[in-house]
C-alpha cells in the first residue's frame, strides 16, 4: 500500500510551490507595466522590497529583467530588519544550486544563483551594494531596523528639483513575512518619501485581514496598492484595486503634497551638505565627464560611470596608470573598525565588501589582477596598541565574517609562522595588486562605454567660464629656426569645455586654486620589497602591526610603510628601508623568522598618500571655500549664525567634484566612494546613509564647526 501521508505532504508542498510561482508571475506582470514602450536605457528603474523574501523570487525577477529589458538598468532595494532572515535566505539560496530533477535545467538561472552566493552578503547594519550584469542589475541590501534605514536615505533628483522624482522608487513588493505591526504609518510615510508620485505597492496575500489593513494605510499616504490574486488553477492575474484605477485627485492631492514636503524638509535640513547631480551642460560638452587622475579613485569612478553608459575622459599626468600611490605591488584590504562602530567604521565595512565584489567581477571577466583573500591578522606592538585592539574587538558583537578575536596559538596557526600574540583576524581580508586593479577597472570601463585616457597630461590649472570647465596643460613649442641654441618655449593648451569635472588626482588634489584649501595632507610612504626565503615562504596571511607584511607574490613580500609628512622628494631612502625592518622586528620581538626579512637589495617603491584628519575619504561637491569664508566674515559664531549655516545652501563650485583623501586604505575605501559619486552624478539614490554623506563631504571640516556656532 502506498505511503499516503508522504503522498499528501508531497502534494501540499507542490501546491504551495505553485501558489508561490503564481504570485511571483503576477508580481512580475505588475512590474512589466513600469517599462515604457520605448525603452529608455539612460534612466535607471528603481524597485523596492520589504523583507528579503524567497531567493527564487529574486532570481526569477533578475531572469525576467534580463530577458524582457536587457538594456535597462534596474536597481532593487531590499530592506530586511531581521538579521536572522539573511541566514535563512542564504540556506534557501544554496539549495537552489541543486535544482529539482523534475524541472528542465536552466543554466542562466543557475549562474545567477552562483553569483548571488559568491557575493556573500554579510549580516551587518546598513547598505551592501551588489552589481551584476555590468551594472544593469544593482541589488542594494539594507539590513537593520527598516524605519531607521529609510529615514537615513536621501531622496535625490536627476535635475536637482524635488518635484522631479523619476530617480525614486517606482514599485514596492511587500513580502509575506511583513506584518501590519511593523508596516505602520510612520514607515509608510518614509516609503512614500522615497517613492515616485505614482508608485504602487504590491501584496502577495491580499485576502488576509492584516494585509487589508496595510493596504488601507498605504492608500492613506497616497500610495497606490496592487494585489496579486491566484485562482485554484494557479492562473495569475495582477489587478489594481478598483478604487485606485482612477486616482481621486481631490483625495490624493493632500498626501502627495505631504510626501513632497517630507522630501523638501529632509533636503532643507541637509543644506550644509550639498549633494548635487552632474550639470546637464550643452551640445558643446557632449555629456562627457572629465576626470583628472590615474589611480584607483579615477579608474573606478570611470568604471562606475561606464556601467551607467556615461562618456568619460581621464587626464593622467604620468605615462601610465598607477604611477603614484596606487602603484604598489601589494596592498592590504581590511576594514577600519572603531570601538563605537560609528559611521566611519560602518563605511569601511561596506567599502571592504564592495571592493571584494568589484575585484571578483573583474577577475570573473578574465582581467589579470593578482590578489589573495588570505585573511588579515592584526596584533599590537606595545601595551597601548594592544589595549586599543582589545577595546575594538570587545566593544561590539562583530559579525564573524567581519572580524573576530584570536588567541596566541590560533594566531600562529593562521599565519603559518610563529606569532604567539593574541589579536584580531579579518577572515575576508587579504591583499590586492593596486596597479593591476587600477588598470583592470579602466579596461573594463573602456569595454562598456566611451571611456578614454590622455597620458602625460599634466593639468596645471582649471577654470570655469559660463558654467563650463576648461583644463589647461603646458606643452613645449619647438622653434623651426636654424639657430639650434634657441630654447624651446612653453605655452598653455586649453582642453574643454566640460560640464562636469572630477578631481581624483591623489597627491595633486590641492594643486588647483579651487581645491587648494582642502585639508588633505600628503604623507610619503616607502614600501620595501623583501625576497621570499626560508620561514617567510610559509607566511599564509597578511600581518598588520607596527608595520605590515604580506605573503609572497612572485617571490617577494611587501613590508612597510614609512610615514613622512609633506615630503620634499620621492627618492629611495635607505633610512626608511631600515625603519621598515625595525617595525617588523619591533612588532614580533625575538621571532627567528624576522631574521629572514632582508632589506639589503634596496628594493622599494615610494608614493604619497593624501590623508584627512578624520581618516575618511573626500567625496562629493567641491566646496567654494572663498565664498564660504566671505560668508563667515559676515556671520560670525553666534546662535543666529548656526541657523544661517544650517538653512543656507553651502557654496560649491558647480560642476566640480572631489574624490580623494583615501589615505593608507584606499583599496578598501576608494571603490565604494567612486560608486557613490557616480550615483550622485547620475541623480540616483546614493547607497550611503545621510550621516555617511555628511562624513565624506569635502566641506565637512568647516561645516562641522559652523553649524555648531564655533569659530573656524
UniProtKB/Swiss-Prot annotation:
Localization in the cell: Cytoplasm
Entry superkingdom: Bacteria
Gene coding for it: mnmC
Record protein name field: tRNA 5-methylaminomethyl-2-thiouridine biosynthesis bifunctional protein MnmC
Source organism phylogeny: Bacteria, Pseudomonadati, Pseudomonadota, Gammaproteobacteria, Alteromonadales
EC numbers on record: 2.1.1.61, 1.5.-.-
Catalytic activity: 5-aminomethyl-2-thiouridine(34) in tRNA + S-adenosyl-L-methionine = 5-methylaminomethyl-2-thiouridine(34) in tRNA + S-adenosyl-L-homocysteine + H(+)
Any one biological process term the GO annotation gives: methylation
Entry similarity comment: In the N-terminal section; belongs to the methyltransferase superfamily. tRNA (mnm(5)s(2)U34)-methyltransferase family. In the C-terminal section; belongs to the DAO family.
One Pfam family from the record: DAO
One GO cellular component, as annotated: cytoplasm
Keywords: Cytoplasm, FAD, Flavoprotein, Methyltransferase, Multifunctional enzyme, Oxidoreductase, S-adenosyl-L-methionine, Transferase, tRNA processing
UniProt keyword tRNA-binding, yes or no: no
Organism: Shewanella sediminis (strain HAW-EB3)
Record region (FAD-dependent cmnm(5)s(2)U34 oxidoreductase): 292-712
Cofactor(s) needed for function: FAD
